[in-house]
Amino acid sequence: MPSKPADGTPAAKSPATPAPPAQPRLRVLAGPNGSGKSTIQTELKPEWIGVFINADEIERKLKDFEGTLSLPELGISSKPSAVLRRLEKHIKDSPFAAKLGLHRLLGNMTIDKVGVLKVPGPFDSYLATVLADAIRRKLLEEGKAFTFETVMSSRD
């Protein structure tokens, strides 16, 4: 029973302590092609998913939007210049990107002030895979909750 001051009025309640923020989560939907990874993603609650990173979706967006990709829509909130440096470092350091000849992108990508990445073509699944990996790594750096889909078919 709450205590009452001497005048009989109810004591003021102390402000509620806010719940601690949820811990960021990383979820991986993995399996061979056609195993239902994308289907499972559509059945999960959005609050469970966080940001969803899918190389197939990245490839489609690059093709549909002439090489542009909104990084804020993918959960990235760092300064554009820092994100661009991180993307270029990832491409430079990735043996997979080197094998694919993606070093041609170095110095040729831009990110505008609202976080839209512009990448020169051609736009294919290999480019999308490297970008998806770089985006996942950036989300990890930023401490964001996210889910990604992968076939886990390569050590790279």
Q: For the regions a protein language model found, what residue spans apply to each?
A:
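Short hydrophobic/aromatic beta-strand immediately N-terminal to the Walker A/P-loop
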Residues: L26-V28
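The conserved Walker
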Residues: P32-N33
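Hydrophobic positions on the alpha1 helix immediately C-terminal to the Walker A/P-loop
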Residues: I40
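Phosphate-binding P-loop
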Residues: P15-P24, L139-L140
